From Swiss-Prot:
GO biological process: phosphate ion transmembrane transport
Binding site for ATP: 38-45
Its job: Part of the ABC transporter complex PstSACB involved in phosphate import. Responsible for energy coupling to the transport system.
Protein name: Phosphate import ATP-binding protein PstB
Keywords from the named record: ATP-binding, Cell membrane, Membrane, Nucleotide-binding, Phosphate transport, Translocase, Transport
InterPro entries: AAA+_ATPase, ABC_transporter-like_ATP-bd, ABC_transporter-like_CS, P-loop_NTPase, PstB-like
Length: 253
């Protein structure tokens, strides 16, 4: 039986009594860019947060059903959510490097706090992660500087390096280019093509055009349900549902 990077089974998510994710069944293959697209408020960011148990931090949120990572239900009582978040990293919409830490420390912090490396080994991990995020050549001579003077795109790649340093299996990205200029956006989109060789990328985007450019598979979410899911080219060029066609052509926002 094929093992998927992420599989959901009858996933339902509530904020209080409001059901925002309504019985979603989804299978995300390994080593792809998988886009979740849909209008604002459709539930795509909530769904993304269920994939690494970030919703645990919201006392209003309740999760029912299963989310399986490499075959294991991460909502089982014996699963450590800290370990889940180590294996499933998250990049948020607003670039959020720690302003009080240097560029080096921003990449190293997760590794240090988890006791995974120190000394020269830590130096090598930081260098490797910055190279992997295509940022090393831009910052290698200012690792002791603070990130305030980095561009928005550089800050977001620094955050990606911080995630990579933890050696995750999956990287979740919640509209990672929404607040970045076109040059920075292009660099991050190019980076996704490289990262999917080693990781599974799940990308929330408000832009159908971006989903079409960078993803291998796409799910269109509307009012908490999946309307259509499949290979990106098929969904955009030959959608099965009228709602999907309206969304990808800009008639539904």
């Amino acid at each position: 039986m094929k093992e998927f990077a992420i599989e959901t089974r009858n996933l339902r998510i509530y904020y209080g009594s409001n059901e925002v994710i309504k019985g979603i069944n989804l299978k995300i293959p390994k080593n792809v860019v998988f886009a979740l697209m849909g209008p604002s408020g459709c539930g795509k960011s909530t769904l993304l947060r269920a994939f690494n148990r970030l919703l645990d931090l919201n006392p209003e949120a309740k999760v029912e059903g299963e989310v399986r990572i490499s075959g294991v239900n991460i909502y089982s009582p014996d699963v450590d959510p800290i370990r889940v978040r180590r294996e499933v990293g998250m990049v948020f919409q607003y670039p959020n490097p720690f302003p009080h830490l240097t560029i080096y420390e921003n990449v190293a912090i997760g590794v240090k706090l988890n006791g995974l490396a120190k000394g020269k080994e830590l130096d090598e991990i930081v260098k490797w992660a910055l190279k992997k995020a295509t940022l090393w050549d831009e910052v290698k001579n200012r690792l002791k500087d603070y990130p305030a003077n980095l561009s928005g795109g550089q800050k977001q790649r620094l955050v990606i390096a911080r995630v990579l340093a933890m050696k995750p299996k999956i990287i979740l990205m919640d509209e990672p280019t929404a607040n970045i200029d076109p040059v920075g956006t292009r660099k991050i989109e190019e980076l996704l093509f490289e990262l999917k060789k080693d990781y599974t990328i799940v990308l929330v985007t408000h832009s159908p055009a971006q989903a079409a450019r960078v993803s291998d598979y796409v799910a269109f979410i509307y009012m908490g349900k999946i309307v259509e899911v499949g290979p990106t080219r098929k969904v955009f060029e030959n959608p099965e549902h009228e709602l999907t066609e309206k969304y990808v052509t800009g008639a539904l926002g």
